[in-house]
Amino acid sequence: MRKMHDAGFYHRDLGNQNMELTPGHDGVPGEVYFVDLNRHRIRDRLTEKERALDFARLDVSSGFLQILVQAYWQDVPPDEFLREMKKARRNFRWWQTSRLWRHPIQSWAKSRTPNPNGPIPHRDIWIWNNLTAQAAITLDKTDRKRLRSNRNNLKIAGTVLQSGWGAWAEYKRQLKSAFQNKVDLSGRIGIAVDTVDLDFDKQLGHLKRLGTPPVLLRFAHHEGREQWEKTANNLDSLHQNGHEVMVAILQDRRAVLEPEAWKEFLEFVLHRIDGKVSMVELCHTVNRMKWGVHTLNDHVKLLEPVVELKKQYPRIKFSGPACIDFEYHYVIAALSKTPKGLDYDALSHHLYVDRRGAPENLQGGYGTVEKAALLKAIAVQSDRCDQRVIVSEVNWPLKETGIWSPVSRPYPMAGQLGDKVNVSEQHYGDYMLRYLVLTLCSGFVDQVYWWRLVAHGFGLIDERSNGGWRERIGFRMLEFFLAQLGNATFVKKLEVAPNVYALQFERESDTVTMMWCHGGIFTGPWPVEYSAAFDSIGQPIEPSEVGESPIYLTSK
């Protein structure tokens, strides 16, 4: 389109029906042909308005339209172009909508004989981004807001008004108990591994360096039976090697639209994993439209088959509702709408805090500890789940990983450095260790699964590094942490100075104090006498100060 316009060719009827694409081969894109040229005009130079008008009739979801516009301009689009495109597309939508009144008989006849091969409604388009292992954003913020049901919003608000005060009162009680009880860390820190795009045996080799931690595997509806079988075989291997395994069940939009296919998927997975898993998380990120769940009713439809399947597989425990981020109003609503006959054995949640930077940073007065306490309070107050809380997915996205970062644009513009949420590998490791002990040792979270072992944009190991797979510093940090504290018992949080954290752990023959200083440097005095000190990756040190990166002080 850009080449056509730069050549002075103004199409004036550029809808999808007037484009022909030939398939590409071996990574080389095919040819693009524009047809039906009888309305065209030749210009010395197209105006911004004329360029925008050629975008008006494109039938493409708003999320991908943004990518197309970025690719077209290779820079920030001019304001005039965006303004004219928005106006032209609004006028064209009205023209399409008014067809019902302009051609009532033709519209009625067409509605009586729907075309099964016709275009998919934009709201039902669902595309997988294998680079970031997540669903792609197909709708922009305006369309997502427009498609949200007011009735659904009222349901959420009503549930929060009904249950929110009880959860708030329980939160106040829970917060007083932070770091007040002993916590055995054995089996509490898990790792997610990939079964689709990466060498599974190679991942197991690195996993052994971390001991025998719990492992999370995904089964995704869109993958198909061949991949489900492959994942099930990998699960068998983990089970035989002594790993506790948790399974996450991922839906797509088709799961909502084709309930029988979804039920068959659930039957296959539960049959293959019965007796081999500790927990099954039902559905995924149900408070995000891009994951195919648009309303609470959609979520209920996905859960209904589990009510009967639960009777067939009484050994399997289920967790949910698997919402993401600090959007607990949706957690409360999703729990309340859980079908009768299905009570969760744990509240599982994707508690990301990466957009705030360090885990101690506040969001509306809530740091990670406060967010975990409120999540625990919701679990305690709900009669639809057990009091156990699992963070089934968390990480920080990494700098300089481009389109592999889960928070970066799928089509970066020239000179764009990436989203400001991305962090360095050093900070990734520091934040990970701090997040783990804050959530677990506070007593509010029972288990955390790190997402994930290997991923260029967000993993402990970089599979795209020159020279082969590279263990990032975060991997070495976690390896040393688990070797030192993986089977230790948290005893107490020592009072030191503001923003200085000192958590004490008991081992069989000694104690370990893990320390760091959030947002500054602490130079002492040290809260304990120690016989040895180590940095975050296990190097012996003579500490004169401690900053963002945790250190370990051992005492006899």
Regions found by a protein language model. Give the residues of each.
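Substrate-binding cleft of secreted/luminal carbohydrate-active enzymes
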Residues: 119-140, 277-278, 394, 414-459
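Catalytic domains of carbohydrate-active enzymes, especially glycoside hydrolases
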Residues: 163-166, 182-224, 234-237, 244-246
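Catalytic-loop of the protein kinase fold
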Residues: 9-16
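C-terminal beta-strand-rich structural cap/linker in extracellular carbohydrate-active enzymes
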Residues: 539-556
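Noncatalytic carbohydrate-binding groove/subsite architecture in carbohydrate-active enzymes
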Residues: 296-435, 442-444
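C-lobe/activation-segment region of protein kinase-like
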Residues: 29-97
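Carbohydrate-binding surface patches
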Residues: 495-529, 536
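Glycan-recognition and catalytic regions of carbohydrate-active enzymes
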Residues: 442-447, 451-509
